[in-house]
From Swiss-Prot:
GO terms for molecular function: neuropeptide hormone activity. GO terms for biological process: circadian rhythm; glucose metabolic process; neuropeptide signaling pathway. This is Crustacean hyperglycemic hormones 4. The modification Valine amide is found at V118. The keyword Kinase does not apply. PANTHER family: ION TRANSPORT PEPTIDE, ISOFORM C. The gene is CHH4. Hormone found in the sinus gland of isopods and decapods which controls the blood sugar level. Has a secretagogue action over the amylase released from the midgut gland. May act as a stress hormone and may be involved in the control of molting and reproduction. Disulfide bonds join C53-C89, C69-C85, C72-C98. It comes from Penaeus monodon. Belongs to the arthropod CHH/MIH/GIH/VIH hormone family.
Amino acid sequence: MVALNTLSAVSAALLVLAASPSPASARSLDASPSSAFSGNHSLSKRSLFDPACTGIYDRQLLGKLGRLCDDCYNVFREPKVATGCRSNCYYNLIFLDCLEYLIPSHLQEEHMEALQTVGK
């Protein structure tokens, strides 16, 4: 009986939460998730895109390359790694060193293909 009362209380609490208006539902449908955190400042979809990259804009590939640089920075904690890895559209020695250090050799070709696609 105690378990049933607890279950009923939890169910009632969930119903109240589901029925109450939330700040997220008050946002317009065309608002981006980033605008919720930045106030009136809206981010462009390509705001993190390096204009030096003259290849194909592929958000997924750029994210993969960017995560490699983030991981490398997290390992070494050197500011020059964070900025240098992304410089020249990832076509630099720091990026190659990070690739060699963090990615197993049999998976490095995948990152090099991504570099060729988005790069110079």
